[in-house]
Amino acid sequence: RNCEQAFDASTHNTERPRAGRGVPSVDMDDDRTDTRSPEEKRAAHTDSHPGLADRLGPMALYCTQEAGTERAFTGSLLDEKRDGAYRCAACGEALFDSDDKYDSGSGWPSFTTPSGAAAVDVRTDSSLGMVRTETTCASCGAHLGHVFPDGPGAAGERYCINSACLVFDERPDD
């Protein structure tokens, strides 16, 4: 199965509020702040969702759980132009919005900002002989991609995200 078929709303974590459009931000000093590493979050999420490997499929499992990267220009969401939200393939948490997606020419879906300040976590990634900033799902720790300081706009950030790590939900017409 592909990532678009992977999200199961019955396993979606709705207990922890997330920041985003129309959702109040979480106070980072609040005692609900999750201080676990992405690896600890991934392990806990995988342990509590034993069907995750079957649900995600090989590429999404490799990218989200092993910090893998799909080949450039091969992702199913690279050319997605519809209005909607991009969710974590592993847990269903809202991560990015189509309003913030743009064509960076990199070969991966690119966004100027996450859907909310608490949607993603970032940390230094010094693997593969280079220093980058890794982006993970703040809710479950799934690897998403990397953020680079060469994006458009005032913040100048480019969130370069694997399609396999995302599920797209089209926004209904009003």
Predicted regions and their residues:
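Residue-identity detector for glycine
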Residues: 20-22
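N-terminal targeting and processing segments of secreted/endomembrane and organelle-targeted proteins
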Residues: 26-39
